[in-house]
Amino acid sequence: MKKSTLFFFLLFTIVSFAQKPCEKDPIYNQFDFWIGEWKVYDLKGNLAGQSKITKILDNCVVLEEWTSAKEQQGLLFSGKSFNSYNSATKQWQQNWIDNTGGSTEYLTGHFENDAMHFISRPFNNGGKTTSVRKLTFYKLKDGKVRQHGEISNNEGKDWVTEYDLEYRPEN
């Protein structure tokens, strides 16, 4: 009897530790409103691209796979973003990488008022200017998502819109 009790205790302990942490803590689900397959439009209603958002790595990472609708300078722009909650810093973060060699790293992010807010680390924007990017995803009431990208060239005192997109469900 003692051996079987010990066996079940050890088995329960092992199974408990084997659970996936990103499935247990609801903070990892804060960005789930973005998951889906989307047609993405600019503010004028023009199709800007398509985006597929999924969870990977045992639901710890929200992956975006973006493809633009039109070629620019002979290239169909595409990229991926990897979005995750960093439990050590208690911040959401995003890493964007694209097929032009571009990348943006957002290490400060949080979910508040039905929106995911990111700020990039400062970067050299050609020459003497240091810039910062702000990226906000708004969960809209009609099942859509708004993505608003902004840039500041004066340490966040003033912001200029780089793009403003609306994600509409494909189906």
Segments predicted by a language model, with ranges:
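Hydrophobic small-molecule pocket/channel-lining residues, especially in calycin-type beta-barrels
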Residues: 19-171
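Bacterial Sec-dependent N-terminal signal peptides
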Residues: 1-22
